[in-house]
Amino acid sequence: MLNIRILVVGKIKEKYFRNALDQYLKRLSRFTKIEIIEVKDEATPEKASKSENLEILQTEGGRLLDKINNRDFVIALAIEGKLITSPDLADMIREIPLDGYSTIDFVIGGSLGLSNEIKNRANAKISFGRITLPHQLARVLLTEQIYRSFMINEGSPYHK
C-alpha cells in the first residue's frame, strides 16, 4: 500500500480546519496510509530583515528535511511550482509507485514558504494557483485533492 505523508510547518489552531482535515483523512484511510507530520514553526518578527527571514526559512527547512527519507518521492507545494489540475495530481499519485516509490511526501512551508534546500530536494514542485494560502488552509486543500485523486483513479463520480 502506498504511504502518503504531508509534512508541514506549524500546527492547526482553528477547530474548523482540524474538522475538515480529519474528515478527509478518514476518507483516505481506505486507499492509503496517510499521516501528517508537523514541525515547529519559527516566530517571524513583523519587520524581519531579509537575513532574518532566510534564517527562519533555513531553520524550518532543516526540520522538514530531517523528516524526509532518501527513498521518498517529494512533492513541494510552491507558488512557483507547476500549475496542475486534479486529474494531473491523480496521474502523479497513480504513476509514482510504478517508478518504485512506496512513499510520497507532500511538503507545505510556513508563512515564509519553503527553503531552497527543500525545493532542491523535491522531485516535483506543484502549485494550486498563484495565490498565497494560509498553511492551515493549504493543508486541507491538499488533503481534499489527494482524496479526489484516489476517487478519480477509481472512476468514482465524486470528481464531477
UniProtKB/Swiss-Prot annotation:
| EC number(s) reported in the record | 2.1.1.177
Q: Does the keyword Transmembrane helix apply?
A: no
Q: What is its main location?
A: cytoplasm
Q: Which GO terms describe its cellular component?
A: cytoplasm
Residues the record lists as binding S-adenosyl-L-methionine = L77, G109, F128, G129, R130, I131, T132, L133
Which Pfam family name is an example for this entry?
A: SPOUT_MTase
Q: Report the InterPro entries cross-referenced here.
A: Alpha/beta_knot_MTases, RlmH-like, tRNA_m1G_MTases_N
Q: Which GO terms describe its molecular function?
A: rRNA (pseudouridine-N3-)-methyltransferase activity
Question: Which cellular compartments is it found in?
Answer: Cytoplasm
Quickly give the catalysed reaction. pseudouridine(1915) in 23S rRNA + S-adenosyl-L-methionine = N(3)-methylpseudouridine(1915) in 23S rRNA + S-adenosyl-L-homocysteine + H(+)
Keywords annotated in UniProt: Cytoplasm, Methyltransferase, rRNA processing, S-adenosyl-L-methionine, Transferase
Q: Output the PANTHER family linked to this UniProt entry.
A: METHYLTRANSFERASE (PTHR33603), RIBOSOMAL RNA LARGE SUBUNIT METHYLTRANSFERASE H (PTHR33603:SF1)
Q: What does this protein do?
A: Specifically methylates the pseudouridine at position 1915 (m3Psi1915) in 23S rRNA.
Q: Which NCBIfam families match?
A: PRK00103.1-3, tRNA_RlmH_YbeA
Q: How does it assemble?
A: Homodimer.
The UniProt family comment states:
Belongs to the RNA methyltransferase RlmH family.
Q: What is this protein called?
A: Ribosomal RNA large subunit methyltransferase H
Species of origin: Oenococcus oeni (strain ATCC BAA-331 / PSU-1)
Q: What is the lineage of its organism?
A: Bacteria, Bacillati, Bacillota, Bacilli, Lactobacillales
- The gene that this protein is the product of is rlmH
